[in-house]
């Protein structure tokens, strides 16, 4: 209720919004994924969780990767009232600049000491320190943390799968069909 009051006062969102959190995971020169988690008035809606593997040509840019993920999510799901970006004002402004839709966008950035609870919420109307606004911190930090957890989980899964496939395909006499049979046999 307090978070909804904040949204009403500061972002003119008058109903229980569908908030989608985005996070980018991956290292430079490696696979990169964008995760998307959806929250409604009942909490997380895992049926709308998605992650997207970022194409290699834009994977070196977190900002372009983020825009790629947001656009892909909006195209496939589309049911969004508020975008929450794990990043700062730069991330928020870059996403807004590259979207051709009228969807509210906010961002959560870590504080100077990167301690939990010292984050800042960025909106088009200004920035708010979480330590001074207990009413907004729980909801937005929960969404940010869930997006981060989901991003890391999927990044690690993809990375492990890529390593396994790469290793098996390097074995003499083992091709894609044998690899598929091995995965099917061991259900992994």
Predicted regions mapped to residue ranges:
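Acidic, glycine-enriched active-site microenvironments
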Residues: 1-188
């Amino acid at each position: 209720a307090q978070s909804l009051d904040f949204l009403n006062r500061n972002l003119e969102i008058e109903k229980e919004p569908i908030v989608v959190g985005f996070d980018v995971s991956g290292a430079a020169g490696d696979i990169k994924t964008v995760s998307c988690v959806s929250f409604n008035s009942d909490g997380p809606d895992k049926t709308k969780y998605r992650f997207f593997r970022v194409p290699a040509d834009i994977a070196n840019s977190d900002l372009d990767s983020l825009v790629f993920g947001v656009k892909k999510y909006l195209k496939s799901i589309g049911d969004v009232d508020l975008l929450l970006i794990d990043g700062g004002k730069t991330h928020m402004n870059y996403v807004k600049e590259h979207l051709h839709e009228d969807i509210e966008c906010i961002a959560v950035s870590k504080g100077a000491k990167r301690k939990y609870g010292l984050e800042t919420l960025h909106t088009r109307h200004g920035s708010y320190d979480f330590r001074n606004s207990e009413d907004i911190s729980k909801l937005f930090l929960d969404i940010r943390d869930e997006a981060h957890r989901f991003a890391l989980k999927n990044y690690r899964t993809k990375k492990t799968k890529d390593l396994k496939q790469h290793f098996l395909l390097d074995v003499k006499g083992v091709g894609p069909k044998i690899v598929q049979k091995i995965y099917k046999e061991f259900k992994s």
